[in-house]
Curated annotation (Swiss-Prot):
Function of the protein: Cleaves peptides in various proteins in a process that requires ATP hydrolysis. Has a chymotrypsin-like activity. Plays a major role in the degradation of misfolded proteins.
Subunit and partners: Fourteen ClpP subunits assemble into 2 heptameric rings which stack back to back to give a disk-like structure with a central cavity, resembling the structure of eukaryotic proteasomes.
Keyword Ribonucleoprotein attributed: no
Family, per entry: Belongs to the peptidase S14 family.
GO biological process, one term: protein quality control for misfolded or incompletely synthesized proteins
GO cellular component labels: cytoplasm; endopeptidase Clp complex
Reaction(s) catalysed by this chain's protein: Hydrolysis of proteins to small peptides in the presence of ATP and magnesium. alpha-casein is the usual test substrate. In the absence of ATP, only oligopeptides shorter than five residues are hydrolyzed (such as succinyl-Leu-Tyr-|-NHMec, and Leu-Tyr-Leu-|-Tyr-Trp, in which cleavage of the -Tyr-|-Leu- and -Tyr-|-Trp bonds also occurs)
Gene: clpP
Compartments (UniProt record): Cytoplasm
Source species of the chain: Ruthia magnifica subsp. Calyptogena magnifica
Official protein name in the record: ATP-dependent Clp protease proteolytic subunit
Amino acid sequence: MDIENLNQIPIVVEQSARGERAYDIYSRLLKERIIFLVGPIEDYMANVVVAQLLFLESENPDQDIHLYINSPGGLVSAGLAIYDTMQFIKPDVSTLCIGQAASMGALLLTAGAKDKRFALPNVRCMIHQPLGGFSGQASDIDIHAQEILKVREKLNQIFKLHTSQTIKTIQKDTDRDNFMSANEATKYGLIDKVLAKR
């Protein structure tokens, strides 16, 4: 979320016996334990999402947190910071894809608590291997290539853990961009259920 878009964020006014209070819509939804992960996954966004997860855990460690995802993916390190926090905290994190969950967005979608991973009917999910482009000395390029292979193996292990697919299947399916509908994502094990209505 960048500064230019702050003027476009709706404000919600809540009335109580003590008067009125204005919230931006995302802060109001956070009170309902809903976190929005929207847009490219980068360091700033990851820090905000991690902070929200930790805050909601401190507020009530026994109540589910709802993570709504509409993301084309992004940085592996930023995504893994969110992933690790989702697994670390006590509350279950329920995930819901709205729009798209591609690349790291798909990994975070499938990382939700078992039987609490959802998608709306017209979403698109996409999984693939990590991307990287490097220049420099041959030895440095080789170091980066080896690191990408290690990262790929790590991401494949995470997908295996949450989808119950075999490593061999995941390696084949992530070799190129692999797009899925909501129903296909359910069959693959990325999500548990497609939601058409509340």
